[in-house]
Amino acid sequence: MLHSGKKSVKISWGMEKILISGMGIVSAMGNGVNENLQALRCNCSGIAPLRYLSTAHKEFPVGEVKMTDEEMISLLQIPENQPTTRTSLMGIMAVGEAISNANLQLDKSNHKLKIALINGTTVGGMDKSEQFYTDFLTNDTKNAYIATHDCGACTEMIADYFGIFSQVSTVSTACSSAANAILLGAELLKSGRADIVVAGGAECLTKFHLNGFNTLMILDKEHCRPFDAARAGLNLGEGAAYIVMEKAKENSRSFEQGKEEIILAGAANTCDAFHQTATSPQGDGAFLAMKKALEEAGISPEQIDYINAHGTGTQNNDLTEGIAIERIFGANIPPVSSTKAFTGHTTSAAGSIEAVISILSLQNNFIPNNLNFKEKMPELSFTPNFNDVAVEQNGNLKPQKSELRHVLSNSFGFGGNDTCLIFSKN
């Protein structure tokens, strides 16, 4: 599916439309679609001091989901002796909402349908591995520990909880994982290998994240400032989000009443393989991903109404992504914002969390603010979407455009693995 040498994945979209029939999300902003929407509209960031993860690095603010593992286990009514991980628990919560949102029944009425779960994650159950590491050498059940901690095991835990999936796959491409899960899900639908796909990603915050990104010296000790001249790095986060996809002509259920139908209009994945952790100076992978996604969607750059940027807040990403955006859009750059200042960088889950945010933007005709922005980057011609007086008395963000029809969402992973998704009103 993924190729190096600045090549890209292409999907033959044809005349068939991929309908988004449901979605679910758990993030630092809140649990569920409604809580996340309200947080976006009132400029309420979920970034806060560390509370749930035990680590020596208390100096870094993060975007944690505001629930303990025990609270999620109780809410989901999972037996206490059943192996679980924080990643799988958040995934179950988000998949459950997506299934409910799509009016998908968890009974035998779906037994003839080919329903696939495509999950993007990288650390899997590493939160448990870190807890058990110290007694690994002396504990007789060491194999039981390891067996439930890999990426695929987390996906299986999510699938087993619902019992409706005939196909289960795990995608692990770092910070583009969830976006690639959505892309793979679309391919399964187009090829007829699945009738319904639940695709997205889940990732919990671990010491591995904090220690690794701290070693790279790209963590900000303050709230991150994407596309700001004084940006100093990213804030890590955690969460899960999934969308339910199916061919529009086969859909017999309705999306949430009163909401416009949204389709996945185009998608593309590229890999420029420039560096293990850095992007190419001219943003070649990002440029090619956006270019190919636009071609697959059959729309011009001028038709994009909003770009949900990868926008991590690091020196490297924001500059090279900005250059790639300028190469694609020229002098007609649409509003751009990064929502990672709301959620933190949720790494493998970022692509699907931001896919849900993009869909919410389309359904509600608003553009999320680029929080914490103060000073324009001198290297770029555009400034991100920021309006510090954009909150009305009722707490809702004033729409930045009267109508949104096409939203582009970027997700870029280490190794130059770049994915672009385009969502449109049907």
Q: Where are each of the predicted segments found?
A:
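ACP-dependent fatty acid/polyketide chain-elongation machinery
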Residues: 7-80, 249-263, 356-370, 419-426
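Conserved catalytic cysteine-centered active-site region
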Residues: 9-14, 48-93, 124-139, 143-184, ...
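Structural signature of cysteine-dependent C-C bond-forming condensing enzymes
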Residues: 11-14, 102-118, 133-143, 157-168, ...
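Condensing-enzyme catalytic core mediating Claisen C-C bond formation in acyl metabolism
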Residues: 16-21, 44-50, 219, 223-297, ...
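Conserved small-residue
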Residues: 22, 40, 95, 117, ...
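Feature captures the FAD/FMN-dependent oxidoreductase FAD-binding
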Residues: 87-110, 119-121
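Alpha-helical metal-binding/catalytic segments enriched in His/Glu/Asp
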Residues: 182, 240-248, 355-359
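Short glycine/threonine-rich loop-to-helix capping motif typified by GTGT followed
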Residues: 274-283, 312-329, 346-353
